[in-house]
């Protein structure tokens, strides 16, 4: 399974949205109706899955599904 698929599955599971609603341009707040608690739980799940910590400053910049995928790819390339 690709990184993109992994991230999308986590988002579908955490936010309880339909997979068809999740694409790289989906905004967590505007398109997927996530609130701040949802986003905090999502960040925690991503940290656990990919085994690194996401700083609060970085987390605030992750507004779309694509932002998360790009961030993880960058972190994995370190």
Swiss-Prot record:
One of its GO terms (molecular function) is acyl binding. Belongs to the acyl carrier protein (ACP) family. 4'-phosphopantetheine is transferred from CoA to a specific serine of apo-ACP by AcpS. This modification is essential for activity because fatty acids are bound in thioester linkage to the sulfhydryl of the prosthetic group. One of its GO terms (cellular component) is cytosol. It comes from Chlamydia felis (strain Fe/C-56). SUPFAM superfamilies: ACP-like. Signal peptide: none annotated. This is Acyl carrier protein. InterPro entries: ACP, ACP-like_sf, PP-bd_ACP, Ppantetheine_attach_site. HAMAP family: Acyl_carrier.
């Amino acid at each position: 399974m690709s990184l993109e698929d992994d991230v999308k599955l986590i988002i579908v599971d955490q936010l309880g949205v339909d997979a068809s609603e999740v694409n790289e341009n989906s905004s967590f707040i505007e398109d997927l109706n996530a609130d701040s608690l949802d986003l905090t739980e999502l960040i925690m799940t991503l940290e656990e899955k990919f085994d690194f910590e996401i700083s609060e400053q970085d987390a605030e910049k992750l507004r779309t599904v694509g932002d998360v995928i790009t961030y993880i790819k960058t972190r994995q390339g370190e």
